């Protein structure tokens, strides 16, 4: 009887170890983390986060006209026609899961155009403070969030702002491409970085 109990306990122990290994392997293949060390947050995960607390999503603007051979939309300091298409596609996918949000951009042509094409008619508020990319960006985010504490916020800003936030909040090296984004939230007066937004 004692031998049977020992054998049974060993079997259970091995089973638990196998389950743990399977879980670890599953996490490894799920690509839950970006190569830069930031958690990856897709549309569905973002929607679940938004049910827990309002989210703040910061996007880099779409493709710049002055750094591309693609056709410009209009002003050379703005975005390309391809950039408008990419912004509209991103906006459609985003709005399908997060339909209710306030929209902001810094006061440059490229961020304003990106936000406009992303939103498909939603009211846009331009705020020059969103061009400041040191600690000032946190004050700007908290100020916007305090105006409507229960609303999600989308901000169109610049790559150096996103790079600064990732390094400052999580010591991560983040070099955002056009329309890459970060997900944040404000809690008890503090701004937290949740991860990198991945559109799929």
Curated annotation (Swiss-Prot):
The Enzyme Commission number assigned here is 3.1.3.-
InterPro entries registered for this protein in UniProt: His_Pase_superF_clade-1, His_PPase_superfam, LipoPS_heptP_Pase
One GO biological-process annotation of the entry reads: lipopolysaccharide metabolic process
Q: Name one GO cellular component term.
A: periplasmic space
* EC supergroup of this enzyme: hydrolase
| Biological or metabolic pathway of the protein | Bacterial outer membrane biogenesis; lipopolysaccharide metabolism
Query: Which GO terms label this protein's molecular function in UniProt?
Result: phosphatase activity
| Highest taxon above the source species | Bacteria
Compartments annotated for it: namely: Periplasm
- SUPFAM superfamilies attached to this UniProt entry: Phosphoglycerate mutase-like (SSF53254)
Alphabetically ordered keywords of this record: Hydrolase, Periplasm, Signal
Report the leader peptide range. Answer: 1-25
Identify its protein family: Belongs to the phosphoglycerate mutase family. Ais subfamily.
Task: Tell me, in a sentence or two, what this protein's role is.
Answer: Catalyzes the dephosphorylation of heptose(II) of the outer membrane lipopolysaccharide core.
Q: What is this protein called?
A: Lipopolysaccharide core heptose(II)-phosphate phosphatase
* Organism (species): Escherichia coli O7:K1 (strain IAI39 / ExPEC)
């Amino acid at each position: 009887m004692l031998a049977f109990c020992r054998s049974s306990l060993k079997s259970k122990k091995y089973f638990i170890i196998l389950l743990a290994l399977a879980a670890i392997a599953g996490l490894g293949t799920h690509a839950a983390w970006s190569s830069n060390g930031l958690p990856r947050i897709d549309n569905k995960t973002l929607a679940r986060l938004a049910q827990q607390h309002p989210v703040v999503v910061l996007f880099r603007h779409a493709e710049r006209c002055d750094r591309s051979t693609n056709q410009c939309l209009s002003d050379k300091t703005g975005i390309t026609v391809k950039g408008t298409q990419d912004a509209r596609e991103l906006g459609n996918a985003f709005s399908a899961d997060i339909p209710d949000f306030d929209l902001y951009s810094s006061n440059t042509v490229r961020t304003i155009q990106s936000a406009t094409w992303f939103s498909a008619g939603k009211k846009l508020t331009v705020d020059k403070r969103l061009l400041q990319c040191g600690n000032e960006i946190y004050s700007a985010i908290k100020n916007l969030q305090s105006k409507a504490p229960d609303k999600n916020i989308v901000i169109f800003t610049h790559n150096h702002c996103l790079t600064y936030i990732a390094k400052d909040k999580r010591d991560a090296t983040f070099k955002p491409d056009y329309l890459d984004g970060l997900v944040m939230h404000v809690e008890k007066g503090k701004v937290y970085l949740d991860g990198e937004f991945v559109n799929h």
